Regions:
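Membrane-embedded transmembrane-helix bundle of lipid-linked glycan/lipid transferases
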Residues: 1-212
């Protein structure tokens, strides 16, 4: 078996390495990469957060690309568990949260994204997805205002990892909200959740508009 596995893994490693070396040279937002295809705007069509996180992992690894990848995999597993542990404590079910946190990384879809597809951006989204879904459900049930900024921030972070995946999540939540509205009749809460997701998109406007 080749190491590291994943169809797109080396693309993410290369991009993280390019950002890492650009930052070392004083360029914190590299725009153009002449080594990719016939030259490409590396931050225009691909969400930037994964590249910066890969660069951070490479820095922690002392500059080693593959060591940085291993740190990425380990940190995704760790932060996935932390997300579920926090949710479990909030729901007064810490043991259930800890159990789900342990198995979340090993769910078939998550393993497929990380080790078969090599979609490190989607794997990074998995850290924020449980918190986002939890915040949406809690707001719909109790309309506590504290969950609004959590929805906005977590959705924006997912969009900064993988814009297309964030769009699919937004569509799934929209369908859920429509069903919830017909069942519970709480149109205002549903509208506020949808507006919060739209605000998550709007926060990224300075990058999002230019990337389209």
């Amino acid at each position: 078996v080749a190491y590291p596995t994943g169809s797109d893994t080396m693309y993410h490693i290369f991009r993280g390495d390019y950002v890492y070396n650009s930052i070392k040279e004083g360029s914190w937002y590299p725009i153009y990469n002449s080594m990719w295809y016939n030259g490409v705007e590396i931050m225009r069509y691909w969400a930037p957060l994964t590249a910066y996180y890969m660069a951070l992992c490479q820095m922690i690894a002392g500059g080693g690309q593959l060591a940085g990848y291993l740190i990425f995999v380990g940190s995704v597993c760790f932060f996935n568990s932390i997300s579920w542990l926090i949710i479990g404590r909030k729901m007064n079910r810490p043991y259930l949260g800890a159990f789900v946190g342990l198995i979340w990384f090993f769910m078939p879809n998550n393993l497929l994204a990380l080790f078969v597809e090599g979609n490190l951006a989607r794997s990074l989204c998995m850290i924020f997805l449980p918190v986002f879904i939890y915040a949406v459900c809690e707001y719909l049930s109790g309309r506590k205002r504290i969950y609004i900024p959590i929805i906005i921030v977590t959705f924006a972070l997912m969009a900064m990892c993988h814009l297309g995946y964030a769009g699919m999540i937004a569509l799934a939540v929209l369908i859920y909200c429509i069903v919830y509205m017909f069942q519970q009749g709480n149109k205002r809460a549903v509208l506020e959740v949808i507006v919060s997701i739209l605000l998550g998109f709007m926060v990224l406007g300075i990058w999002l508009v230019a990337s389209l």
